[in-house]
């Protein structure tokens, strides 16, 4: 039987959103490693921590959640989890945490290396596991940890009292970092960073909203890849430019009757929760083979922070999916389903 000849992969257009976003995501880890070599402070940051703080202060950042997802997607999640479990961590705690704690011990992983941190920036508007995870990292690495307590909101709207509470912590975190590393806050730089962050967020949220068209101009699994940029680089100028390119491509796909979903779109679903990174391809192909397009997810939009003032920025960080009450959580999902003509949920 003749051997199957694989067709060479078509090179990615360097002007495409896929190329630009892939480069930004790939450069994020490399940039932090280079910064470390140059003596620039490096922070490990939880994904919903206000990126405006380290970006304004010039602190290099790396995101353990993003690293853990990459390691898992490349097939090394179990190996790293085994390292953490051998040190006594239970196998029923967060796999992100186990991979990260294992990396803190080994300080290397060929599937995704990252610069070791000088400080940890943590917030609990994602999950309370994050606090214990980062506390253990701080202990194991003997470095400071700064936490923003962004509490669960039992009310529908963010109160003035909550804005005041979180705002005070925001500035306290700034002052701690200034003192730790001899840095100085720059209001003009902060204004620039917030502009970059909002530009990227608006384009991203507009791009994800293009699923309002039937058929959708994109495969929803694209969002799970592209959102890495919103986690790691939304405060950078190049993120906004790349997201605007993505939005432009999705709009053109709609006008041209094309899509990155390479099958007939028979059904449209919403994906709930975190992607199963080790089985992302199996999930994507399993749905596509049945004509099912995952057109929206609460997860992807969670990393778009659009605001027009400091208080609105604080409210945005207090309004991420895991920090809001049941009624608001329900209404967000209902809106996504109605806006994007969803027929089922996974």
Question: What annotation goes with each model-predicted range?
Answer:
Residues 2-41, 167, 171-299, 305:
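A charged, amphipathic alpha-helical module
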Residues 19-22, 94-101, 320-326:
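Short, flexible loop segments at the rims of nucleotide/cofactor-binding pockets, characterized by
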Residues 42, 118-119, 268, 344:
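Structural motif
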Residues 44-113, 118, 126, 133-134:
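An N-terminal, globular interaction/scaffold subdomain
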Residues 55-85, 270-340:
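Redox- and metal-dependent alpha/beta enzyme cores, enriched for Fe-S-associated oxidoreductases
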Residues 85-92, 164-176, 314-322:
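A polyampholytic, Gly/Pro-enriched intrinsically disordered region
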Residues 103-105, 110-210:
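Internal, well-ordered alpha/beta segment that forms a basic, Gly-enriched binding/recognition surface
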Residues 117, 337, 341-346:
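Proline-aspartate-enriched helix->loop->beta-strand connector
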